[in-house]
């Protein structure tokens, strides 16, 4: 209808919720809870204050012009079971928008399986192979596989296929995101968090898109960034045409990482430690309209 609606997820006390508010439009622009839609969703949370909090991404996975939703986190109950879980309450799923109503996309992985349910990590979307379809990046903790990172390629037919052969670490308490590091028009991947499979060691990894459906870990970039319980914001901070990023978490200072243009970053701790947080989120926005 041309009006932006609102979705909130998280915990209130001990109860997890997913609430949807519809924008009434002009002249009042009131947000009214849509209980029919709310009942279609599980209540979602990150489960712990140390965990990542990116539980929801809005995107159009099937290019039909309607905004779908990718969700992950702790849900439990019947919802966790129908998305292929094993009783630990972890969910990763797509809610398909059918002209204003939502339903679960069943068996999205090759038409036979569900996404691996995780919590404590993050989700992101981008068209990593430039075929016109949005792909999915999922990371977090699973009771059987421990910390994992998975990339799913969108096949354009309501199914996704896992992209294998990438030397992901997998993590909890962090964030994994798409970022075009080298301005070649292909989305690379940055992975920052704590490796549950390796004594909860904090780490940061950069994976360069080879433009052929594969990625190569860029070892030289590893020593410059790491963190736990972190949140990422990606953008061109200094207007040099290169994507930088900001990182904050309980295991690291609030830090800007400036893109050097050679698949490496330089750390700049330019803001007070008051910006340091855990289990939160960060974003860039031009508040004063000065071009930065």
Predicted regions and their residues:
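Glycine-aliphatic tripeptides that mark coil-to-beta-strand junctions in extracellular
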Residues: 2-8, 65-71, 132-134, 138, ...
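A detector of repeated loop/turn-to-beta-strand junctions in beta-rich toroidal repeat architectures
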Residues: 15-17, 87-91, 146-148, 200-203, ...
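Beta-propeller domains
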Residues: 171-177, 192, 196, 225-234, ...
């Amino acid at each position: 209808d041309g009006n932006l609606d609102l979705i909130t997820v998280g915990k209130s006390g001990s109860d997890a919720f997913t609430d949807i508010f519809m924008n009434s439009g002009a002249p009042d622009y009131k947000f009214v809870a849509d209980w029919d839609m709310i009942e279609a969703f599980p209540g979602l949370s990150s489960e712990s204050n140390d965990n990542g909090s990116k539980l929801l991404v809005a995107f159009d996975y099937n290019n039909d012009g309607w905004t779908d939703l990718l969700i992950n986190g702790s849900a439990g109950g019947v919802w966790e079971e129908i998305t292929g879980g094993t009783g630990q309450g972890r969910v990763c799923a797509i809610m398909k928008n059918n002209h204003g109503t939502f339903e679960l996309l069943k068996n999205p992985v090759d038409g036979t399986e569900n996404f691996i349910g995780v919590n404590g990590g993050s989700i992101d979307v981008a068209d990593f192979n430039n075929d016109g379809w949005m792909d999915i990046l999922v990371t977090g903790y699973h009771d059987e596989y421990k910390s994992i990172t998975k990339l799913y390629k969108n096949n354009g037919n309501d199914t996704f296929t896992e992209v294998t052969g990438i030397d992901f670490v997998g993590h909890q308490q962090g964030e994994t995101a798409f970022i075009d590091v080298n301005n070649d028009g292909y989305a690379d991947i940055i992975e920052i968090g704590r490796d549950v499979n390796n004594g909860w060691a904090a780490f940061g990894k950069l994976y360069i898109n080879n433009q052929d459906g594969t990625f190569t870990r860029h070892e030289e970039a590893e020593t410059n960034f790491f963190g736990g319980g972190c949140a990422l914001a990606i953008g061109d901070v200094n207007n040099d045409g290169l994507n930088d990023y900001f990182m904050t978490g309980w295991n690291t200072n609030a830090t800007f990482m400036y893109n050097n243009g050679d698949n490496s970053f330089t750390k700049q701790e330019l803001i007070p430690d008051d910006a340091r947080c855990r289990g939160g989120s960060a974003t860039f926005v031009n508040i004063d309209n000065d071009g930065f």
